[in-house]
């Protein structure tokens, strides 16, 4: 049981992230666990079709957005001596595929930023975890919109549901809860998640 509150924001606008963090800390209470789950996928584009604006947008969402959240949240956690920041990432953080110039650069930056944040704040009692989502997630609002209703439903019928070939958001959430509750003597910094039937990113030819 419990309650939840949602907010809409444009994460590339100045001050909106910082103001929302301050509001939550004041009106709801101290942030014990922060989850950064902002995507930055603009699709497959050859270099010639990737504009400066599109490339920068990936960085603003994936890397600079995390920097802003960390800058707003981690100092408060440091004052309290504990806290957790879990960062959702993608295979692009460790492998740059053709046509993924913006996404790979942005996610690679996200991963390195997580390592830097962990080096600074881990010894201060703050758990920073970087989670690679190495596969397709059964999410109508993201993958469904990317593929379109017909292709998404076809994918669900062949790989999802009882086939367990698409990652279920609620099972990802279970894993995040586990990470958030880890004892500090056994903290996970980086982990990767995928369906049992998927080939791990390092085994792709």
Language-model segments: which ranges?
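Amphipathic alpha-helical dimer-interface segment in Rossmann-like NAD(P)H-dependent oxidoreductases
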Residues: 61-79
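Conserved mid-core segment of classical short-chain dehydrogenase/reductases
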Residues: 18, 39-56, 99
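A glycine-rich helix->loop->beta "capping" turn
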Residues: 2-5, 23-36, 42-43, 187
